[in-house]
Amino acid sequence: MTGRTQIFLGLLGAGLLGQGAASLVLDALGLANDHLPQRFANSDPLHASIHVIWGAAMIALVLTGLSDADATKLALIFGIFYTGLAIAGLTFHHPLGMRLDRGENVFHLLVGPASLAVGLASGLRLRERPA
């Protein structure tokens, strides 16, 4: 069954994969910079690779028929990870050597809690289902 949580994860995964891959390509070609539209592509290869890995994993899991319970867990795990990344980016200058600046921190502050909210709502829906 493909529910709302799987759709959210699939779309989020596609966005992360696309953004991360574009970042890596622009960086490899020496075209990454702080001007739009390239600014949406982070020139930090480690950070871009994290987006690619999360995006590819989300897409693969959704396409293999991720159950509602597992989709809930994935949304919560991703939400915790990205909310933590946002907090680290706000607390430390370039945590773990990643260039996390204002734009990246804002993105992580949006997508992390949003994923937590989706995961929590999905978990509540699962608990309310008749056995």
Regions from the language model: what does each represent?
Residues 1-131:
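Membrane-interface extramembranous regions
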